[in-house]
Amino acid sequence: MSQNYYLTKIQEEFAQLHADGLKKANCKKIPLYGCVLNGELMEMPKPDLTLRDPVNFVMKKDGAVASKFVKTGLVDYEEKTFRYYATPRAGNPHACKSLTKRSQNDLASQLRYDKVYVEKYPDPADRGMVVHPRFGEYMQGFPRDWTDPEVAMVNPLKVYPHPRLKAIDLFSGIGGLTLAADKFLESVAYCDIDADARAVLNARMKDGSIDTAPIYEDIKKLDATKIEADVVIGGFPCQDLSTMGKRKGFEGQKSVLFYEAMRIAKECNAKAIILENVKGLLNCGGNEVFFQIRDELSSNGYDYKYVVVEAAHAGAVHHRARVFFLALRRDLIPKDIELGLRTPLDTKHNPFWTEQPIPAVEERMVMKGNKKADARMKQIGNVVCPLQGELAMRVLIPSL
């Protein structure tokens, strides 16, 4: 669909609503001020300021007077609740206070008029994500500019059989990355030094949520030469890399266990390595840690790509940016392809856009101060969110 299609559709729908007297008693919830499209001001009813109001954005274009609007609005109309999508970017609503030129061009595609019943889920955290088919294509590895009509006839969201590769799951914790990888990998061994974490893994194996496999305690004593595995995955300790700590890098005693993960990968001659850690890894020690990881992978015959994923953009109710590395053994990579993504992926600064602007992902509102969510986060600690890991793997795994 073209940008003009969405613009025309939106204008028609709004015109009809106004013609039906939406400004009057029929409207109870309209947290939407208005927006500028192609230099024209589209007026909206004033919001009910007693409702929770997401962050307002300001956009200026073609000399038009700046006008404010919020990212999502709910409208009660004829005993139904409709939802307007007005997300300037598919990222953190706090990350962009003014729209860039690219975002202005994408705006018409993001303003959707969609009949979504939300009375059942008044809390934004309980609403599901909306994934557009073209976004599904992208997540399955299709190029962004893919237009082959024969391929387009195939349902892009169809699930095709894919053999699960065998994986050694290091620093398993309570299974966050394990659950994320379940659709793609079969865990044949786990390893975590924390007794409580091992107890959780045992419970997960009993209820069938993860694969049944031996659990090892000390990674330094793990002999991977006796384990048949294709992939090594793990979120190695972040305490020496996080901005919340002293950031000693690999000079510390915990994050240096990255090298143990590399030892295990070499012992089992892994085809691929998937690593997870805090985003602070990328600039720790003036990028020194990142360069050390790069050099270690390269010297052992691996090429790599990485993605940065914000948990909230994967559908979680909390903010947590994590970096995911995928390294492939160099001898397994065809010479005529480029490993990994066409472009670097960072869900905060590079939302998922295609060549033609289309609706992509419904961003959930992340609520600070939610007591229930805060309590849950304290209980599970600093673990990787399965939704977050799965999103990264859906981007990375097609390379396998």
Language-model regions, residue ranges each:
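Short helix-loop-beta connector
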Residues: Y160-L165, E228
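Class I S-adenosyl-L-methionine
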Residues: K221-V231, Q239-P386
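Short, well-ordered alpha-helices that flank and scaffold nucleotide-derived cofactor binding pockets
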Residues: L179-K183, A203, R263-K266, D295, ...
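Feature marking protein-protein/ligand interface regions
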Residues: M1-P161
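Glycine-rich, N-terminal phosphate-binding loop of Rossmann-like dinucleotide-binding domains
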Residues: F236
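SAM cofactor-binding core of SAM-dependent methyltransferases
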Residues: A167-K220
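Glycine-rich, phosphate-binding/catalytic loops in enzymes
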Residues: P156, F184, K206-D207, K248-G252, ...
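C-terminal substrate-recognition regions of SAM-dependent nucleic acid methyltransferases
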Residues: Y6-L17, L22-K29, G34-L37, L41-T50, ...
